[in-house]
């Protein structure tokens, strides 16, 4: 949305066609300066550009003959498009929405009206000649895209190619002013995978640094728990993450001093450890960020445990199913439900009451003689268990070092049995 800055100029982002009938639109920052009688467009907001960076295009308002909404025949696949007719050329521009387009058309038509001054015409002619000589000087200065890095405490500007090494765009003069792809151009589809919570709001803003207090354009992303900002939309790892639980207040920055004084659409995110100053592209965008961040913080304060509760449920459900698939289930297969319950109840007490390397025999007990066990097996069935009816084959076998448990009958043979041997007695 266009807005009026502190110098009473109409400003905002628009997409302009690089060459007429090419169908390729590039995002630029436009300034309608009625005092200088010209329409200027930059690679980005001049406050975010390097010192001395000029406009990449200019158009005198006196050359504009008509500004109108583009017909579907002219641009059938470009919504919210309007055209500026000037010097036998047509400049096609695309706005963000219908209201944005109407505001720009009305402002340009109002600014390009021809008015006859009441005073002499000679001073006005001199001013027009001076203003006409200014745009060629701006066009002579080459515009090169670059990235800014701090290496060893020194600011280093490195030229970069924006189209992947095919050479700099805009090196060939077209039908009108040379245009280059801007770093502020926002692609429609990002490469960063959304692995976390769904995003509530995302977009580019300008943020003040913490150490050098420099202003840099960053891609911000807001979800239910954090505010992250990235160097560009394609990055996967954020430069910093601000947790919403640490955010104390978010509001428009009204008390300004120093460098903040010249910043429009500025709001601040106050945390317990630091205050973040963020500049949006328009007042509507600023109020939208403030509203969404405040709503997310309030929702987190009202329902802080919903997420942790849902996670605990999801972790408990797989664990409960794993109990049935554990080692104990192998021992209990083929048993009736009652016997399975008994085995589950008795197994912990039996297994935990003895360790094979520390046998502690009770008083009055005698260990099984070594001759009664086979030399090839370390485990020996308890006396009477092998032939006793009702005992399952899957019962636990006693280790040779385990003390024998006391029995109700200390003597396991029946003395009245005729088949008993005298050697057994």
UniProtKB/Swiss-Prot annotation:
Specify the domain of life of the species encoding this protein.
Eukaryota
Chain intervals with Low complexity compositional bias: 312-330
| Membrane as UniProt keyword | yes
Domain (PH): residue spans on this chain: 7-113, 198-298
Q: Where is this cross-link: Glycyl lysine isopeptide (Lys-Gly) (interchain with G-Cter in SUMO2)?
A: 141
GO cellular-component term (any): plasma membrane
**What spans are recorded as compositionally biased (Basic and acidic residues)?**
400-410
The protein's GO terms of the molecular function aspect are:
fibronectin binding; laminin binding; PDZ domain binding; phosphatidylinositol-3,4-bisphosphate binding; phospholipid binding
Q: PROSITE patterns from the xrefs?
A: PH_DOMAIN
**Record flagged with keyword ATP-binding:** no
How does it sit in the bilayer? Peripheral membrane protein
The UniProt entry, under PANTHER family, shows: PLECKSTRIN HOMOLOGY DOMAIN-CONTAINING FAMILY A MEMBER 2, TANDEM PH DOMAIN CONTAINING PROTEIN
Protein name listed in UniProt: Pleckstrin homology domain-containing family A member 2
Q: Which organism is it from?
A: Homo sapiens (Human)
Instruction: Read off the lineage from the record.
Output: Eukaryota, Metazoa, Chordata, Craniata, Vertebrata
